[in-house]
Amino acid sequence: MLRRRVVALSVFVLFGAASFANAQAPEGGGARAGAPAPGGAAQGARAGGGPARRPALFFREEWKQNEKSDEHPITQESVANANLELKLYGPNAKEMDITGKAGDENNPIHVWAGLCTGPCAVLLRDKASYADLSGLARIRWNTKMSGYHQIRPIVKLADGTMYVGDRADGSTRDWIVSEINFADLKWLKMDPAKSVTTGNIVDKIDLSKVDEVGFVDLMPGSGHGAGGWVDVAQIELYANKVAR
């Protein structure tokens, strides 16, 4: 009787061990324990395999003062980068000014939109290349605001269509450097003549061939003194180049 009990107990233990081993084994020959879940490591990877790569600097603009270093209307002469063309949009865009001093981090050379009596946009166009803003392309800028004003990224595609991103940047406390990744944005079309948004929000647009890139302030300025305006100093765009 005792022998039968020992045999039965041994069979029970062996059966339990086999069941535990089967439970731990991956189904269908899958990855071993501790391996990343399917697709987990591939998030953000390029179509050809491997991690997505951050694009190099496409352009940098620091703006250029005149000989007097005073406040004056922005023109093509205000662009320090010889490879870039200045593009202004909005009925009052020519009311934007350049001010500030070179080498002064408390008052760097910058675009000031305080005199814009309506929405105003500033875009930059590379003479030789379109910008591919897909993937990990991003824009970095040094800005300061007054009141509730903020700037938003704006793009003009190769077909002439213009879009404004749904993210806004700006701090009223001090100059702040911030970045926006284009892949994170949703978009609204912009009427270039009025610098106002139109239509419904678009989740994704084709950013593989962008003609111009810049910023827009969708609120009118309040003039000199505290109230409502935007300051935009250095701008850096990180994107791949596409020949024109």
Name each region found by the language model.
Residues 24-244:
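Beta-rich carbohydrate-recognition modules and glycan-binding surfaces
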Residues 8-18:
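Bacterial N-terminal signal peptides
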Residues 1-9:
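Bacterial N-terminal signal peptides that target proteins for export
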Residues 19-23:
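Juxtamembrane cytosolic interface motif at the C-terminal end of transmembrane helices
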